[in-house]
Amino acid sequence: MITVVGGTFSKLHKGHKALLNTAIDTGNEVVIGLTSDEYVKKNKVYPAIPYSVRYRTLYNYMIKRTNKFRIRQIDDRNGNAPYEKDYEVIVVSPETYPRSLKINEIRISNGLPPLKIIRVPYVLAQDLFPISSTRIINGEIDTNGKRITPLKVGISTRNEAKIQAVEKFVRRLVKNYQIVKNENYNLKTQQPFGEETMELATQRAMEALKDNDYSVGIESGIIYESFSKKYYDVHYCVVIDRFGNVTRGMSSGFEIPDHIVDRMKRDRTFSEAYSGYLNVQEIDQSEGIIGKISEGKLRRIDLIEESIRNAFILRLDPDFYDSTYTPP
């Protein structure tokens, strides 16, 4: 039985090793299709690392783990996988999974049995983008996925609590980062209700993306819950990355009394309505109304952080959510 895996392997990184180790773990002889220099020159955006160098690095990695392997030069993405009758298993990444389906279509049309496909999950760098040779060659990350250049995160806000919450989350991911504040935006309302909350959070994120790695849009709004017939205050977060992937998350919500809702419907924000009710001039941005209500046991910044975290949950396990990245 033979397991096949293919690639360019320009910079042998954690993602490549996951593919190779999975192939070895099948217990079969492993055939590695290594793309030729000509293929790399035609199809990759980075300078070609010579075949001989890539071959030697790949060989040295494999020989320490198994002697049941061969490395074959291939000149296209499919190699000889569509035609080899002895191949039984193919190991692929999420990016190359569609190609394996095409390979099986060709095999079937050639009267050969389809290959068993083993799809290896994404291997993410610190910044939650997949590790790739392109990123390593560009000096953005190292072969283990550690971020080298600053992770740039844009946010459209004039609220320091939102900036602090974003920075706190990003700091958990990487040590090298830059928060880029965008204050040049205009919203159609200062107090969104219902789906306006989601729309304005999306607008904030879109206007902050620019040339950043991520952009974050956070909006607090009022949503109506039909079962209890009550209104709730929530924070909604939209995250857009440089590849165009969009993820969303929401904080837990707390009920707003009807008399405050009535004040808000007279063209007031939640903060203005609550301040008027208490006869106070201003509410601290970090503490928020929830801080006043709970006597400091909860703060608005906690709810903001919760919405950010929940928007990034999908990025922590993109395979579970069937997400597809399309990095260069």
Curated annotation (Swiss-Prot):
Residues 153-328 are annotated as: Inosine/xanthosine triphosphatase. It is found in: Cytoplasm. GO terms for biological process: coenzyme A biosynthetic process; nucleotide metabolic process; thiamine metabolic process. Residues 1-152 are annotated as: Phosphopantetheine adenylyltransferase. It catalyses: (R)-4'-phosphopantetheine + ATP + H(+) = 3'-dephospho-CoA + diphosphate; XTP + H2O = XDP + phosphate + H(+); ITP + H2O = IDP + phosphate + H(+). Its main location: cytoplasm. Its EC number is 2.7.7.3, 3.6.1.73. The keyword Cell division does not apply. The keyword Nucleotide-binding applies. Pathway: Cofactor biosynthesis; coenzyme A biosynthesis. SUPFAM superfamilies: ITPase-like, Nucleotidylyl transferase. GO terms for molecular function: ATP binding; ITPase activity; metal ion binding; pantetheine-phosphate adenylyltransferase activity; ribonucleoside triphosphate phosphatase activity. In the N-terminal section; belongs to the eukaryotic CoaD family. In the C-terminal section; belongs to the YjjX NTPase family. This is Bifunctional phosphopantetheine adenylyltransferase/NTP phosphatase. It comes from Thermoplasma acidophilum (strain ATCC 25905 / DSM 1728 / JCM 9062 / NBRC 15155 / AMRC-C165). The gene is coaD.
